[in-house]
Regions:
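Cytosolic regulatory regions of ion transport systems
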Residues: 1-146
Length: 146
């Protein structure tokens, strides 16, 4: 599967490392050339120095013919814009990391789709869900009571 990851920060770098171990065709795009050089030298992936929110950078990264485009920069609006550009270029599926619940609100789902975002990842929400699920297990509740 051809995967383009926009953003080589903590999340994007970690994701690229994990996916490169699974024999995926990974392209990582970011404007930080030093960070990309380190990742390119140490992992089975390709990199493009460019803005994740520019048509030029995303075209060069191959966003127009990728199976999966994942935008995980630290900035929610950049991720939405990157997904919108990638989708318009021809990306099959787009995923954006967000930092507010507003985009997850079911009332906004159709607007998010029209912007070119197929899936949303909200790390804080996922962490809260994991904690709630863990608390449903007896052994976890007992551990907290100690």
């Amino acid at each position: 599967m051809k995967i383009v990851i926009a953003g080589a920060g903590e999340v994007g770098s970690h994701l690229a490392k994990l996916l490169s171990n699974e024999e995926q065709d990974i392209m990582l795009v970011d404007d930080n050339a030093e960070r990309l050089a380190i990742l390119d030298a140490n992992y089975n992936l390709m990199t493009v120095v460019g803005s994740p929110t520019s048509f030029v950078g995303l075209r060069e990264a191959g966003a127009g013919n990728c199976d999966l485009f994942i935008a995980v920069t630290p900035y929610e609006t950049n991720n939405i814009v990157a997904c919108s550009i990638a989708k318009n270029l021809g990306a099959k599926t787009t995923v954006a990391r967000i930092s507010t619940y507003d985009f997850m609100d079911p009332a906004n789902e159709s607007h998010v789709k029209r912007m070119g975002v197929d899936r949303l990842i909200y790390p804080e929400y996922l962490a809260a869900q994991e904690i709630i699920n863990a608390l449903k297990r007896t052994w976890v509740r007992n551990w907290f009571e100690l």
